A protein has these predicted regions:
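Juxtamembrane helix-loop transition segments at the membrane interface in multi-pass membrane proteins
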Residues: 1-12
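Cytosolic catalytic headpiece
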Residues: 10-173
């Protein structure tokens, strides 16, 4: 029974009360999902390549432990790219990162912003596309250089294998 799975319930009244439950709340990250966010879409403006934009973002977020920043660093490492150093960086709590990135490889550096759409708007960055069905519900990370919008990344935390089946089984109970 339940005790062999490590579940102990003290009193039958608790089991009886389960019949009246109509809502279950689960922690998403690491419970429903794998807990390993990954870049799943990259969109840049004309004239800016994926590599340039991602390396600028990676440089700005080099020392961040935020899960979205870690996803960017993992992507760079998987590609075998070197994250360029930044001259300075600043965390803007609940918004994103500001950094000064010197020129690197064949790319110009500049004043880099990485973060939320709201952060970009507050910093006077315009030209961002409207949020649409392809980005709805995903984690978006916007990137700008010298006040100009460069593009965005979408980052997803993959759902654990078998979780959809488990949730559907719970729904039927």
């Amino acid at each position: 029974g339940a005790s062999s799975c490590g579940i102990l319930i003290k009193g039958g009244n608790y089991i009886e009360n389960l019949a009246d439950i109509d809502t279950v709340v689960l922690d998403k990250t690491g419970t429903i999902t794998m807990g390993v966010p990954q870049i799943d879409h990259i969109e840049t403006i004309d004239g800016v390549g994926d590599k340039e934009m991602i390396l600028l973002a990676a440089s700005a977020e080099m020392h961040s432990v935020h899960p979205l920043a870690v996803a960017v660093q993992k992507y760079v490492n998987a590609k075998g790219w070197q994250t360029p150093p930044h001259a300075s960086s600043e965390t803007v709590v609940a918004r994103g990162m500001k950094a000064v990135v010197p020129p690197f490889e064949n790319y110009e550096g500049g004043d880099i912003l990485v973060g939320s759409r709201r952060f970009m708007t507050e910093e006077g960055v315009g030209g961002m596309p409207a949020v649409d069905n392809k980005t709805w519900g995903k984690n978006l990370l916007y990137i700008a250089k010298n006040g100009q919008y460069l593009g965005f990344l979408t980052i997803q935390d993959p759902i654990r294998p078998g979780m959809k089946k488990t949730l559907n089984r719970m729904r039927r109970l």
